[in-house]
C-alpha cells in the first residue's frame, strides 16, 4: 500500500485492537503493525511527527490485586496480550529524532453509549461467569479523548496509563451500585476461568497526572457530561 501520506502528518493516532485469539489472526495483526512501523521509520518528511498508540492495561494481567505502574512486567501468556505487547514494542522502537511515540494504556471504557452502571444494574441478581474478586481498571470516553489530545499537545513519549481513580473489584463495584438502588447483588464467580485474560491489578495513573493531565471523570460513579 502507498503510505507516502505519512510524510505529510504532524500527528498520528493508531487504535487497532486485536480481538481474536487464533494464531492466523495474530500473524495478520503483527504483520500489519510491523509494516506500519517500518513505513513510519522510513517516511520522508521535514517536520516532526507525534504518534499516539492506543493499548490496554490488560497487558499487566493477574497481579493478585497489587498496584502496578508503567514499569511493571507484562503478562503475555494470553495471545491477545502478547499481540498488544508486541505492537507496543514495535511502535516504541521507531528510532527517529523527529518522531515522538506515546503509548496510552486504557482500561474498560465507559461513557456516552457505554453505560456500565446501567449494565451492572441489569445484571442484579444474575450469575455472571467472571471472577468477582478481580480488580479492573476503567477509562472514561471523555478522558480518553482529552488524554489523546493532551498527549499530542504535550508531545508525550513513552507509556502512560490513562485510567480513572477507581480501584474496586467487580464484586465491590457491583455491590456498591446495587445497594444504592436497593437491588439484589450480582452473583460472580470466585475464581477466573481458563479462558479469562485474568486482569487483576490496581493500575496507577500517577504518571500521566504528574505530566499535568487532570481527569474530569474520577470514576463511573460520578457522571460527567461530554
Positions of PLM-derived features:
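Conserved Rossmann-fold NAD(P)-dependent oxidoreductase catalytic core, especially the SDR/UDP-sugar
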Residues: 37-79
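Catalytic helix-loop patch of NAD(P)-dependent Rossmann-fold dehydrogenases
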Residues: 64-103
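NAD(P)-cofactor binding segment of oxidoreductase domains
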Residues: 7-52
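SDR active-site strand-loop-helix element
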Residues: 15, 51-57, 104-106
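A short C-terminal helix-loop "cap" of Rossmann-like NAD(P)-dependent dehydrogenase/epimerase domains
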Residues: 120-130, 183-188
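C-terminal amphipathic/interface module of NAD(P)-dependent oxidoreductases
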Residues: 196-226
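Substrate-positioning beta->alpha
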Residues: 109-119, 129-150
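Mid/C-terminal beta-alpha module of Rossmann-like enzyme folds, strongest
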Residues: 144-199
Amino acid at each position: 500500500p502507498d503510505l507516502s501520506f505519512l510524510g505529510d502528518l504532524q500527528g498520528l493516532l493508531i487504535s487497532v485492537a486485536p480481538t481474536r485469539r487464533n494464531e492466523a489472526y495474530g500473524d495478520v495483526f503483527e504483520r500489519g503493525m510491523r509494516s506500519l512501523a517500518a513505513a513510519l521509520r522510513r517516511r520522508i518528511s521535514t517536520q516532526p511527527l507525534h504518534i499516539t498508540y492506543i493499548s490496554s492495561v490488560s497487558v499487566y494481567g493477574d497481579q493478585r490485586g497489587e498496584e502496578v505502574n508503567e514499569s511493571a512486567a507484562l503478562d503475555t501468556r494470553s495471545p491477545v496480550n502478547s499481540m498488544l505487547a508486541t505492537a507496543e514494542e514495535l511502535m516504541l522502537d521507531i528510532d527517529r529524532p523527529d518522531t515522538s511515540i506515546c503509548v496510552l494504556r486504557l482500561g474498560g471504557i465507559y461513557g456516552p453509549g457505554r453505560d456500565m452502571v446501567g449494565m451492572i444494574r441489569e445484571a442484579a441478581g444474575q450469575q455472571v461467569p467472571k471472577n468477582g474478586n478481580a480488580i479492573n481498571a476503567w477509562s472514561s470516553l471523555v478522558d480518553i479523548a482529552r488524554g489523546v489530545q493532551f498527549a499530542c499537545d504535550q508531545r508525550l513519549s513513552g507509556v502512560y496509563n490513562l485510567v480513572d481513580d477507581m480501584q474496586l473489584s467487580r464484586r465491590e463495584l457491583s455491590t456498591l451500585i446495587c445497594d444504592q438502588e436497593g437491588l439484589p447483588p450480582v452473583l460472580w464467580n470466585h475464581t477466573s476461568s481458563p479462558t479469562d485474560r485474568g486482569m487483576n491489578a490496581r493500575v496507577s495513573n500517577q504518571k500521566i497526572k504528574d505530566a499535568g493531565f487532570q481527569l474530569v471523570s474520577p470514576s463511573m460513579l460520578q457522571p460527567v457530561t461530554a
